[in-house]
Each structure stands twice: as structure tokens, then as C-alpha cells.
Amino acid sequence: MGNLVIGSRGSELALWQANHIKERLKKECLIESEIQIVKTKGDKILDTPLNKIGGKGLFTKELEELLLKGEIDLAVHSLKDVPVVFEKGLDLACITKRADVRDTFLSVKFPDLMSLPKGAKVGTTSLRRSMQLKMKRQDLDTESLRGNVQTRLKKLECGEFDAIILAEAGLCRLEIQGAKYRKAFSVEEMIPSMGQGALGVEMLKNHKHFATLQKLNDTESAFCCRLEREFIKGLNGGCQIPIGVHASLVGDRVKIQAVLGLPNGKEVITKEKQGDKTRAFDLVQELLEAFLQSGAKEILEKAQLF
């Protein structure tokens, strides 16, 4: 049999992730593989904010189509980009050990968020980040920032933005300092996106190597990420709407923190649940119920208008 074909987007970060899985497949599963670069809708449309492009799976749909046709064997995704409902026949074969889940502030001139001047221009791809920035600083001008990590950093260095927000995991994977000033927000300061920091490997469920890839699965990361995905699923949410959710395990206890609101930070719900690990999925349902009772659906409908 020939090598397995790994589908990946073409950015430096996406290829780092695909090569990471390629190396682990060889070392831990004794499987040889090769990488095929695939351009997704989200890669092709770079002059429009992600939430304006519309639809779910902006960075995954084309890869999923190739999986269904049998043209690639597996697709490596940033888990935060993976829709919570799969095309028929597809599923996650594994979720890798999480890297740093935090979001990071980067600036050439200003050491942290609170030192930015009034009206400072902050670049981010994410409505979730915009919302949480506005919760702290209504006076900031948050603007869409598209492109790969290096492109975004160049825009910062050229003075297009006073600061930008990126995922800490991506900076660490590419071994990039990023800017003179770099400061990660705590999870309490900025709740991450579902699955942030983890990779998801998607395959046909009936693929002969689907079960084999469990060797690459990290039990704790997968457990926490599945809780987060369950929360998003309950709100019928995706990665282009302003929702943050983070689950963490300490011993036998689980903590789930979530935030949801308008991108302008003016209507926001923030709640958390803690309890025994054995009740984890019940806690997600309780958290969902608390959000729905606080008007989550209505806020999300309003958020679509931004």
C-alpha cells in the first residue's frame, strides 16, 4: 500500500501542524505519509472579515470534500476551526495534546492592553477576541486582520495596527517572538475559542487506519475539547461568532468557563461551572441552560447583524 495522504492548508503554521502529525504517524503508528496542500475558502478570500464570508467550515470544507472522495486519507486542522457537526461518514480520529490555549497581545510600542492610547487600532480575526477586548476597553478600535501569522506581524511592524491579538500556540509552534512587546492574557482575562491549542485529525470513520490514530490521541485534551464542542453545539454556534469556552481538569474536578456576547462588548454573558469529572457533560448542559435563560439565543441573533 502507498503512503497515506495528509490534507493540509498551505500556511507555514498549517504545514507545521501537518508535519507534526506526519512525524508522529511514522514514529508511533509506523505509518508513512505525504502532505497534499489544499486551498480552502477561508484562504482564498482575504479581503473580507471571516464573519462576513458566511457559512461554517471556512477552513475545512474543501478538505472534507477530498476526504469523502477518498483523495486524501486524513485532514489536519486547528481544532478551533472544525465545525461541531460533521459531514456524514466523517469524524475526528484523534485530538492531540493541547499546546498553550491563551490569546496573546503583541505590540511594537505598547507593553500591554491597558497602556494603549484611546482609539488605538487593534487587529484580530476573531469576533470573540474583539468582544473581550471591548469588555475591557470600549474606546479601542478593533479591526479585521486577515492573513497568515507572518502577514499579520508585518502589518503590525509597518504601523497599520497599534497592537494585534494572536493565539499563543501558533507563535510557540513557529518559534516566533512576534514583536517587542508580547503578553499572553490569562484564561480569565480572555476565554479562548473551543479547542484552541489542540489539533484535530479528521478521517472517514470506516477508514482502515481510523482506530490506529487513537495512538495520537491525548485523553485529557480530548475530554476537555469535547466538553467545549458540546457547549458550542448546544448553542448552534461556530467559530465565526463571539463565543469563548474553556474546560480544564484539575485532578477529578472539571471547570468550564464560557463567554458570549455582541462583538462591541455591550451585551455579554459570562458564566462558569465546576464539579466532579464524572458529571462533566451534565455540567455542560447546566451551563447551557444558564446561558439560554440569560438570553444567549437572542444575543447571538443580534450578533449576526454585526
Regions found by a protein language model. Name each.
Residues 12-24, 55-59, 84, 104, ...:
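N-terminal winged-helix
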Residues 1-46, 52, 135-306:
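Small-molecule-sensing regulatory modules
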Residues 72-76, 162-163:
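Short, Asp-centered acidic motifs that coordinate Mg2+ and/or phosphate
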Residues 79-82, 169-171:
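Short glycine-rich anion-binding loops that position phosphate/pyrophosphate groups of nucleotides
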Residues 66-68, 82, 87:
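Extracytoplasmic loops/domains of multi-pass membrane proteins
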Residues 48-73:
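Short, structured active-site "lid" loops
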Residues 79-80, 88-140:
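A conserved helix-loop-strand patch within extracytoplasmic ligand-binding domains
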